[in-house]
Swiss-Prot record:
<keyword id="KW-0648">Protein biosynthesis</keyword>
<dbReference type="Pfam" id="PF22042">
    <property type="entry name" value="EF-G_D2"/>
</dbReference>
<dbReference type="InterPro" id="IPR053905">
    <property type="entry name" value="EF-G-like_DII"/>
</dbReference>
<dbReference type="InterPro" id="IPR000640">
    <property type="entry name" value="EFG_V-like"/>
</dbReference>
<dbReference type="GO" id="GO:0005525">
    <property type="term" value="F:GTP binding"/>
</dbReference>
<dbReference type="Pfam" id="PF00679">
    <property type="entry name" value="EFG_C"/>
</dbReference>
<dbReference type="InterPro" id="IPR020568">
    <property type="entry name" value="Ribosomal_Su5_D2-typ_SF"/>
</dbReference>
<feature type="binding site">
    <location>
        <begin position="17"/>
        <end position="24"/>
    </location>
    <ligand>
        <name>GTP</name>
    </ligand>
</feature>
<dbReference type="InterPro" id="IPR041095">
    <property type="entry name" value="EFG_II"/>
</dbReference>
<dbReference type="GO" id="GO:0003746">
    <property type="term" value="F:translation elongation factor activity"/>
</dbReference>
<dbReference type="GO" id="GO:0005737">
    <property type="term" value="C:cytoplasm"/>
</dbReference>
<dbReference type="Pfam" id="PF14492">
    <property type="entry name" value="EFG_III"/>
</dbReference>
<dbReference type="InterPro" id="IPR009000">
    <property type="entry name" value="Transl_B-barrel_sf"/>
</dbReference>
<protein>
    <recommendedName>
        <fullName>Elongation factor G</fullName>
    </recommendedName>
</protein>
<dbReference type="Pfam" id="PF03764">
    <property type="entry name" value="EFG_IV"/>
</dbReference>
<dbReference type="InterPro" id="IPR014721">
    <property type="entry name" value="Ribsml_uS5_D2-typ_fold_subgr"/>
</dbReference>
<dbReference type="GO" id="GO:0003924">
    <property type="term" value="F:GTPase activity"/>
</dbReference>
Length: 692
């Protein structure tokens, strides 16, 4: 199926917002008015087309970035619907890698909310053009002008209103179009499908003129020719304004602001017009740059069909019918169903089975995908962030860096049968979601799952049950403590067993001393004169290592220690490898007791970003968690705080930070080092271990 829509007529857009700002509702209206659906799906009825996972329908929030194609004014709009909940912001980030433009939706009541601020920063990072839609103008407490001011104060890039509302709350009926200086009034009885263009109501004329003036001035400031005309008082045509605004939007100089109420079906068609008029096509954005794995040189790929094929996989999902679906955006060239491609990230050849154009969770088979287009492939073994390309012209696009999981919990399958299925399912989840990890705790033997927040892990456990029929018990995670010695000590281990026939004899003398944190284990053989034959030396080391696995204080592994074997004796007949192994183990346990053992706890490097208003509260809270503030940096209205905090004090922190900062703080956490635990913590941990 060759290209049906020229590349300049494509718009790859995302719809991004804080949870509950009306994002999925707006998407539903777009699909309705572009003729993709025949009935409007309401989120609160659990019927929205784009929210297709059972968990989404129940919770009324969007978890997976569903993608769909629709058509408006002769242009194809590929929409990626993204979640607003902070636990799922990874979906937003990976979608941005493949978008050319974004509609940011703000609630006219709540204004610029934390997740929107965070997502706006991501859009800055990925250099994505955007338009803003102030939604929910029908709601009690709605105020377009207050929210517009918040956008000015809280976000980068200057907003420019191209509409203002007519009426508010229950009296909201339409908008003033500042480009054409007329009123658009929606007809209730047609579900907003029809509207009338009227003259601006008398009482809005002065306000409309004032905001039109602001708009023209803002646009003229971005274009020298228009600025001259403006200063000389010449008339600037609507076409000139639109062209200049398109250019300024694509260059991230301005953000056009529109308004409406998606739920009441008002404002959606002009929003679609704005997507077509102001957001870029794949030709308007910088060409993609990657690394050639053979030459390790940077290469640029132009968004043209005759360039070598290269695409970026931004999402992987397991489909109950089709198997693994890999969503991808083609940056150059084209790919046919049934052809072979190179997964350059893994250096592995793959066959593209089927190619699908997606509409939420229904699909249409296609034969070819070309530059600028978004589709899903069946049969490609890939993970999120992989590049697929023409094997003759390999290229690797930048891999996304995802935040490390910040919360873990132990899970245990309820039946033996589920145990076998569980590891396959966990592997599938890890491929789909780079912020989800699963591991086995070698010390406790528990399976641990790690994610971005409690809701994230809840939903994963829920999916195990719904999609794969695996039931698990969920527990609290354990902290992986370690033990270390503080001083030097000498001890001997003697294992002598005399029974009928051949006996057992092993005798060693060792010295232990502490090493620097992170040094691990050093074994020194200082035996001279053959007091212990050399074939018995490795078993001694093995016995010591085994004893180190279960420390003498609370049974945690002993680390950072040097052991010197310097004396001992053997018996011509009775000595054996096993006897020396046991002697080595006995000697180490004895020496460790003498060398005063301490408990080590894992210390995490925590970086918190918070609006300035909450810095005091955040620091106070970190101090109360035995945190040590390592540094602070002011980034405009946000302050970044770095601290070292024991892992045991960080459970529940995500929820706590949210309430401390009204949801506006974010944090990342990674392992830093092990450090000696205070006496009170040691006593508590030892007490818990000896009672279990």
């Amino acid at each position: 199926m060759p290209r049906t829509v020229p590349i300049q007529d494509l718009r790859n857009i995302g719809i991004v917002a804080h949870i509950d700002a009306g994002k999925t509702t707006t998407t539903e209206r777009i699909l309705y008015y572009t003729g993709k659906t025949y009935k409007i799906g309401e989120v609160h009825e659990g019927a929205a087309t784009m929210d297709w996972m059972p968990q989404e329908k129940e919770r009324g929030i969007t978890i997976t970035a569903a993608t769909t194609a629709c058509y408006w004014a002769g242009k194809q709009i590929n929409i990626i619907d993204t979640p607003g909940h902070v636990d799922f912001s990874v979906e937003v980030v990976r979608s941005m890698r493949v978008l050319d433009g974004i509609i940011f939706i703000f609630s006219a009541v709540e204004g610029v909310q934390p997740q929107s601020e965070a997502n706006w920063r991501w859009a800055d990072k990925f250099n994505v053009a955007r338009i803003a839609f102030i939604n929910k103008l029908d709601r009690l407490g709605a105020d377009f002008y207050r929210v517009y001011d918040e956008i000015v104060k809280k976000l980068t890039i200057k907003p420019v209103a191209i509409q203002i509302p007519i009426g508010t709350e229950d009296n909201f009926v339409g908008v003033v179009d500042l480009m054409n200086m007329n009123a658009i009034i929606w007809l209730e009885e047609t579900l907003g499908a029809k509207y009338e263009i009227r003259d601006i109501p008398e009482e809005y004329k002065a306000k409309a003129q004032e905001w039109r003036e602001k708009m023209v001035e803002s646009i003229a400031e971005t274009d020298d020719t228009l600025m001259e005309k403006y200063l000389e008082g010449q008339e600037i045509s609507t076409d000139e304004l639109k062209q200049a605004l398109r250019k300024a939007t694509i260059n991230k100089q301005l953000v056009p602001v529109l308004c409406g109420s998606s739920f009441k079906n008002k404002g959606v068609q002009p929003l679609l017009d704005a997507v077509v008029d102001y957001l870029p096509s794949p030709l308007d954005v910088p060409s993609v740059v990657g690394i050639n794995p053979k030459t390790v040189q940077e290469e640029t790929r132009l968004p043209e069909d005759d360039q070598p094929f290269c695409a970026y996989i931004f999402k992987v999902v397991s489909d109950p019918y089709a198997g693994q679906l890999s969503y991808f955006r083609v940056f150059s060239g084209k790919v046919q169903a049934g052809s072979y491609v190179l997964n350059s990230t893994k250096d592995k050849k793959e066959r593209v089975g089927r190619l699908l154009l997606m509409h939420a969770n229904t699909r249409e088979d296609i034969t070819e995908v070309a530059a600028g287009e978004i589709a899903a492939a069946v049969g490609v073994d890939a993970a999120t962030g992989d590049t697929i390309c023409d094997e003759k012209s390999p290229i690797i696009l930048e891999k996304l860096e995802f935040p490390e999981p910040v919360i873990s919990m132990a899970i245990e399958p309820k039946t033996k049968k589920d145990q076998e299925k569980l590891s396959q399912v966990l592997n599938k989840f890890m491929k789909e979601d780079p912020t989800f990890k699963a591991s086995m705790d070698p010390e406790t033997g528990q399976t641990l799952i790690h994610g971005m927040g409690e809701l994230h892990l809840e939903i994963m456990v829920d999916r195990m049950k719904r999609e794969y029929n695996i039931e698990v018990n969920v527990g609290k995670p354990q902290v992986a403590y370690k033990e270390a010695i503080k001083g030097k000590a000498v001890a001997e281990g003697k294992f002598i067993r005399q029974t009928g026939g051949r006996g057992q004899y092993g005798h060693v003398v060792i010295e232990v001393e502490p090493l620097e944190r992170g040094s691990g284990f050093v074994f020194e053989n200082a035996i001279v004169g053959g007091v212990i034959p050399k074939e018995f030396i490795p078993p001694v080391e093995e016995g010591i290592k085994e004893a180190m696995e279960n420390g003498v204080l609370a049974g945690y592994p002993v680390v950072d220690v040097k052991v010197k074997l310097f004396d001992g004796s053997y018996h011509e007949v009775d000595s054996s490898e096993i006897a020396f192994k046991i002697a080595g183990s006995m000697a180490f346990k004895e020496a460790a007791k003498k060398a005063s053992v301490v408990l080590l706890e894992p210390i995490m490097e925590v970086e918190v970003e918070t609006p300035d208003d909450y810095v005091g509260d955040v620091i106070g809270d970190l101090n109360s968690r035995r945190g040590k503030i390592m540094g602070m940096e002011n980034k405009g209205i946000i302050t970044s705080i770095k601290a070292h905090v024991p892992l045991s004090e960080m459970f529940g922190y995500a929820t706590n930070l949210r309430s401390l900062t009204q949801g506006r703080g974010t944090f990342i956490m990674k392992f830093s080092h092990y450090s000696e635990a205070p006496q009170s913590i040691t006593e508590k941990v030892v007490g818990e271990r000896t009672h279990t």
